[in-house]
Design a protein with these regions (language model features):
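Phosphate-binding site recognition
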Residues: 1-214
Length: 214
């Protein structure tokens, strides 16, 4: 049994809280759509919706379904996704990294500090899970080494990915640093099975950078 992480393979607890709520709408059909994107050029997904639109709950559901730390079949066997042809193929087959960017932004004094803290926290959990394979503090090198040694791909879930553009709306240099990090982390990386990002702002270009030019 894997030890659950805060960011790496966080398990099913957050999603189970949603399931136990008085009002729960089964949106597991989303999983069939994301399953179809895995291993394709469309594996990078960005969902822009207003607050309170259920974006975080959807990310919790995806983390529970894809994450390999907990057998979540007992949960999903009861949901609509269980009838999909791809259901068993991807259930609990991936290492999941789930991040809420707002959490890191709120306790950071700059973009540089935020990105350093994010890497430190995630890589620390990667080292605990894969002590024999992670030799670097750089998140890209760490994940690439894990993939090279184990063949295991990652599903990366990022909530509030666009919070930087609200906080640093007039700081183009900060925006550029952030987008450069996202791109270097995710673009053309063999370890990425699926990247699913949620935000509030509409997708657009910031300066000369395309926010989702993956």
């Amino acid at each position: 049994m894997w030890k659950l992480g805060v960011y790496l393979n966080p398990g099913t607890r957050a999603f189970e809280i949603s399931l136990n709520s008085k009002i729960y709408v089964d949106k597991s059909g989303l999983i069939e759509k994301t399953n179809a994107l895995i291993g394709t050029q469309q594996q990078f997904v960005c969902v822009s919706r207003p607050r309170r639109f259920g974006k975080s709950m959807a990310a919790e559901m995806l983390a529970s379904y894809y994450g390999r730390s907990v057998d979540s079949s007992e949960i999903f066997d009861k949901l609509n996704i269980s009838s999909a042809e791809s259901y068993r193929e991807h259930l609990n087959k991936y290492d999941v990294i789930r991040i809420n960017m707002q959490d890191f932004l709120s306790i950071s004094g700059s973009i540089v500090e935020m990105l350093e803290m994010l890497q430190m926290r995630v890589v620390r959990e990667l080292k605990k899970a894969y002590p024999d394979y992670v030799a670097f503090d750089n998140i890209v090198f760490a994940m690439q080494d894990i993939f090279d040694e184990t063949g295991r791909c990652f599903v990366i879930l990022i909530d509030e990915w666009d919070c930087i553009f609200r906080e640093y709306k007039n700081d183009l240099e900060a925006q550029k640093k952030y987008l450069d990090f996202i791109r270097s982390w995710l673009k053309d990386k063999s370890y990425v099975a699926l990247a699913y990002m949620t935000g509030i702002l509409p997708i657009k270009k910031y300066g000369t950078h395309s926010a989702l030019n993956m």
